[in-house]
Amino acid sequence: MNARSRALLLLLLVAASAAVLPFLRYLTDDTFIHLQFAKHLVQGKGFSFNAGEPTYGATSPLWVLLLAMTGKLLPISVAAPSDPASMPALAWAAKGYGLLFHLVAILALVLLGKRLGWDDRTALGLGVLLAAQAWTLRWALSGMETPLAVACVALALYGFAGVLVRDRPGWGTGIALGLASLARPECTLLAAIVVVTVWMGAERRPRRALEVLAGLGAALLPWLATAWTWFHTLLPNTAAAKAGATLEPGPFVAALHAVFQVELAADALPLALFVLVLAFGNRSNALPVARGRRFFWFACVAWPALLALSFALEGVQVVSRYLLPATPCVLLLGMASFRWVVATNLPNRYGAALALFLAAFVVQNALFTALVSAPSTIAHTSGLRSSLVSIGIWARDRTAPNASFAVADIGAFGYYSERHVLDLYGLVTPVLAPITVREGYNAVVTRALYEVAGRPDYLIDRHPREGRLAQDQDQPSPYRFLFARRIPNLGITRPGGFYYSVYAIDWRVMDQTRQRVASALPGGPQRRIL
């Protein structure tokens, strides 16, 4: 890059930093799950959500370890503040890391464009796409692991291009893929794709593939050995807690529908250009001649497609951040498709066409951010503070230290309450994950199916209707309604208002109710139901 391009790159990074400011105070309930695990590591209570109970309930061990190391080394408090309006110090650290990794990802994509042989303006344009992408902006300062995963993927793609295009060693690529997998477990799929394509497309195939595998192992194996020692499992509990019904048509279609909604909201233009190439291109004029380059682009197509398909097959309830690790490939394909379309139709108007393409992309994503994404996050964060955060502070101040709570959304409540949590979705209470997937959340609550994991003192129910479990009862209810707090949305895909209703559970009434129901069933009182 010449001096002018380097100055433009610096300007791009400054603009990218400014673009995320609308999300400066954005927090999600899942953010507090990471903070809770990191807090307990710093306090010597293990890799645990409930203090002293190790569990693989964190999707991103790398993010938790990074936050814990920060809490250990810096003079900051890892405990929750007493004021629900105050930002936890550890959350500020997470936001700082998020911005850093967001900028690293942009820089890596610009360098990747240069490595592919693109001119400075095209490589910088690729960075503009990532800096302006609405979902990237939304999650950059959320305190979640998403920017870390995107940065690791971008660095892995940079190394991957070096292996296939320039016959560079694969160690760094493997390490970046391993770190990406520790940031988001779905990135193990990308690692598999890269290993296969390096084996098939690199100039020195066995050697380069083994180098990638060695780098991957160097990053992954220490954590896998630790996970087996601590949890006796290699897979996070989220694999079951966030999945629906595997291979069933309903969840499959719902997941694909969510994927299309997420992608079209931000990446409609790059995807439209890619569709044009698929429709009108052919092997001779759309694919590069060099074998390594062909396999690089095959991998860029395979990663987003297989990621979306895996979510659909598992019935995952897809949200935008799950797809962001594939965004660098989507944008790469969009820019490559743009270059082909312009070279085919407007070869002498490349500069003007590039400016128009980038402007259209920026405007689309800026409008979506201003009209939909940013207002949603502001409302959500305010509602989170006034609901789960406030309930957590109430529990910390007004309930016994040994009290336990059954909760659907565990993060903010667990972090602030310092009370034992029984997770109704099974993230940190894995025995409940298959039950909730099979029976549904409503059945778990109304039939007290969570009892298999223990008898909590309180229940925090999430439902559009306030205090619903204590209403319309023909018989005494085991749930004594205490109070409720409202949250205006649970994200863009769940915009309706919800109530978090707090109940005290009377297990004596619960048992008596079951006995009466059992006595009325064929076979008499010996038949006990949950």
Regions from the language model: what does each represent?
Residues A3-A7, V78-A89, V104-A132, V150-A151, ...:
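Transmembrane-helix signature of polytopic, membrane-embedded enzymes
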Residues R6-V14, R121-V128, A192, L213-L221, ...:
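Signature aromatic-anchored transmembrane alpha helix within multi-pass, membrane-resident enzymes
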Residues A16-V20, L126-A131, A154, G170-R184, ...:
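Membrane-interface alpha helices of multi-pass inner-membrane proteins
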Residues F23, L27, I33, F37-K39, ...:
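Membrane-lumen/periplasm interface segments of specific transmembrane helices
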Residues T59, W63, L67-L74, A85-P88, ...:
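Transmembrane alpha-helices of multi-pass, membrane-embedded glycan-processing enzymes
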Residues A108-L111, V128-L129, L148-V165, G172-L177, ...:
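Specific aromatic-rich, kink-prone transmembrane helix
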Residues A140, A183-P185, L189, D267-P270, ...:
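Hydrophobic/aromatic-rich transmembrane helices and adjacent perimembrane loops
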Residues F357-G414, H420-P464, Y479-L530:
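Membrane-embedded, lumen/periplasm-facing catalytic core of multi-pass transferases
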